[in-house]
């Protein structure tokens, strides 16, 4: 088999799994559906590793499948490509997806929608692979929309729950709004360059109008803001926790929310040419890093805390990408995928043991009955905090170093505060769930099944060792992404400041919550502000109410009393006129002769008057 053909294998195997599971969607749980889908993604992962090795040896591939759209001079083919950027992405996507599939076999074993779930899950993986393997913007957009559709189906998987329905609709609508911006960017690209192929577009940037590049980069980033839940399009991310927990692991670690970061990295020649937009992305990312972390400080929902940490970490990635450190952004995406999926799967174990209760203040003393899960979640939390030698240390510190080295000291300080917040809420969660006094009434909390724990093991290992791939990773990526200039920074001092601040934050969280929540100060203004997400969802609700009121007025007054009244009047007028003229068609010979004579007289009068 040619290696270019392997691209098709990697891409279409998850689709085959999705279609296979769909055949049994309305039937009772069939274990073979979960096993078959897991094997499909496993083979896809093996193929991705083979392709990664080829890319490592300076091989790049293109696979033209068929003409997709041909209209005049406009031609778009369904074609795939492999370079160093998406070689990393497909390995991350398929590895995390395979482990989530295996974990899901146990997690969803008692769910009536088992088969349907795997159909959606594999479809999700396929859509993400379309997004990252496409060699043009339109193909990327199709994968982009596929990811949005599958996320809607998975977030609202338990459609009998009103909260799940609302969350899925919110995610879908919010992403459709921002996707319109991305579509505008793609239209402008074709309008100005006459092509949507990455290579052709990027090769013509030097001769393009700067203002047009500015608009294109802004519109594309609007799309990224929706998928990666950047402020103010962030509210759907926490509500997406209504879906099954393994879905959260996939959305937050390897697929949907990383798509926006991937887009900026993929379009790095464009954003390097428009530095104002890049700087805005970095500033917004720093704000979101702090913003997301602050909301996690007080939240009591286990999954939402981890979700807010994703929001915060995406901010770090966008800071790196916005400052032109695209390789560092991709490296943090790479390491983050492992410890974030580990945290979500661990949360799923805890949720099952607690009989679906997610309030961390009503847990406690779970370390002994769930020792392995506790160890995995501690590993994930330490990696998230960025403590040496765990993976997060290498990637997050690189972002802080880049911000400081480029003299963006305010951004660096915001990221430092975000790191301190991250350490605090991470170990607040760990202490309240595993080590604080028992606050629940579950008699025998149990550990997850062995094969579910085994599926978490590779993630736990990678959360520890992935950072040590730093040097070969940057060497590999620098072949296609410009390297960041080396800056003279007091590296030892920066690392010391960050590490000491994070360790002090961890120590404070351990000390504060070792006996559970004892403080009664959780009713203050700041607490309520953070717990209610700065009241932004309520603001959106009020805005929606205004439009709902306007729509109601238009319906009740304009449509019913004006438009409908006009239409009804016209209808009644026609009916009345019809009744008047109906007598001419009553079949009475005398009446018909009268009308005939009247018609002749009218015609004669008309001719006499106008015929002169």
What are these regions, as identified by a protein language model?
Residues 49, 340, 420-427, 499-521:
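Hydrophobic alpha-helical membrane-embedded segments
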Residues 1-8, 20-119, 192-210, 214, ...:
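Transmembrane helix-loop-helix hairpins at membrane boundaries of multipass inner-membrane proteins
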Residues 61-75, 199-205, 398-402, 472-489:
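Membrane-interfacial helical/loop segments at transmembrane boundaries in membrane proteins
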Residues 445-508:
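Hard-cation-handling environments
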Residues 1-12, 28-35, 75-92, 130-143, ...:
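Membrane-entry segments of alpha-helical transmembrane domains in multi-pass membrane proteins
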Residues 41-52, 98, 186, 496-510:
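Hydrophobic core of alpha-helical transmembrane segments in multi-pass integral membrane proteins
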Residues 477-490, 517-612:
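Aromatic-capped, Gly/Pro-kinked transmembrane alpha-helices
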Residues 94-140, 149-451, 456, 462, ...:
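Hydrophobic transmembrane alpha-helices and their helix-loop junctions in integral membrane proteins
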């Amino acid at each position: 088999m040619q290696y270019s053909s392997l691209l098709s294998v990697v891409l279409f195997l998850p689709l085959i799994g999705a279609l296979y599971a769909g055949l049994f969607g309305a039937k009772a749980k069939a274990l073979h559906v979960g096993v078959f889908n897991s094997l499909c993604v496993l083979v896809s992962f093996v193929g991705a590793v083979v392709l990664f090795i080829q890319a490592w040896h300076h091989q790049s591939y293109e696979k033209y499948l068929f003409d997709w759209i041909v209209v005049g001079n406009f031609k778009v083919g369904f074609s795939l490509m492999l370079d160093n950027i998406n070689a990393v992405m497909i390995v991350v996507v398929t590895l995390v997806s395979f482990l989530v599939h295996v974990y899901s076999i146990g997690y969803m074993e008692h769910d009536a929608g088992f088969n349907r779930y795997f159909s959606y899950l594999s479809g999700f993986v396929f859509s993400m692979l379309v997004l990252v393997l496409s060699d043009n913007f339109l193909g990327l957009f199709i994968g982009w929309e596929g990811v949005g559709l599958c996320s809607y189906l998975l977030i609202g998987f338990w459609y009998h729950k009103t909260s799940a329905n609302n969350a899925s609709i919110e995610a879908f609508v919010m992403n459709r709004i921002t996707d319109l911006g991305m579509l505008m960017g793609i239209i402008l690209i074709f309008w100005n360059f006459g092509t949507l192929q990455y290579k052709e577009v990027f090769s013509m940037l030097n001769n393009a109008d700067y203002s047009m590049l500015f608009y294109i980069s802004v519109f594309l980033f609007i799309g990224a803001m929706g998928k990666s839940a950047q402020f103010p399009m962030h509210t759907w991310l926490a509500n997406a926790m209504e879906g099954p927990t393994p879905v959260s692991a996939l959305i937050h670690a390897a697929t949907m929310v990383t798509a926006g970061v991937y887009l900026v990295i993929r379009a790095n020649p464009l954003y390097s040419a428009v530095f104002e937009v890049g700087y805005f992305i970095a500033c917004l990312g720093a704000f979101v890093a702090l913003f997301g972390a602050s909301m996690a400080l007080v939240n009591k929902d286990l999954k939402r805390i981890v979700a807010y940490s994703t929001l915060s970490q995406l901010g770090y990635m966008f800071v790196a990408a916005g400052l032109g450190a695209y390789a560092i952004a991709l490296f943090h995406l790479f390491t983050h995928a492992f410890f974030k999926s580990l945290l979500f799967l661990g949360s799923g174990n805890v949720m099952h043991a607690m009989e679906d209760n997610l309030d961390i203040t009503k847990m406690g003393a779970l370390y002994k009955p769930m020792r392995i899960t506790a160890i995995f979640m501690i590993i994930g939390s330490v990696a998230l905090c960025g403590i040496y030698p765990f993976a997060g240390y290498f990637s997050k510190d690189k972002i802080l170093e880049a911000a400081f080295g480029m003299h963006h000291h305010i951004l660096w300080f915001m990221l430092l505060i975000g790191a301190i917040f991250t350490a605090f809420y991470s170990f607040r969660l760990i202490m309240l769930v595993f080590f604080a006094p028992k606050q629940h009434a579950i008699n025998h909390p149990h550990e997850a099944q062995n094969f579910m724990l085994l599926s978490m093991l590779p993630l736990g290992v990678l959360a520890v060792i992935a950072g040590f791939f730093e040097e070969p990773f940057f060497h590999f990526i620098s072949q296609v992404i410009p390297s960041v200039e080396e800056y003279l920074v007091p590296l030892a001092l920066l690392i010391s400041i960050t590490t000491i601040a994070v360790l002090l934050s961890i120590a404070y969280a351990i000390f504060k919550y070792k006996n559970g929540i004892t403080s009664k100060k959780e009713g203050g203004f700041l607490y309520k502000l953070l717990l209610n997400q700065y009241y932004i969802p309520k603001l959106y609700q009020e805005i929606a109410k205004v439009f709902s009121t306007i729509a109601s007025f238009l319906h009740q007054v304009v449509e019913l009393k004006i438009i409908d009244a006009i239409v009804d009047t016209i209808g009644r007028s026609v009916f009345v006129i019809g009744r008047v003229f109906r007598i001419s068609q009553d079949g009475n010979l005398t009446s018909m002769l009268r009308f005939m004579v009247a018609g002749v007289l009218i015609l004669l009068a008309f001719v006499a008057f106008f015929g002169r």
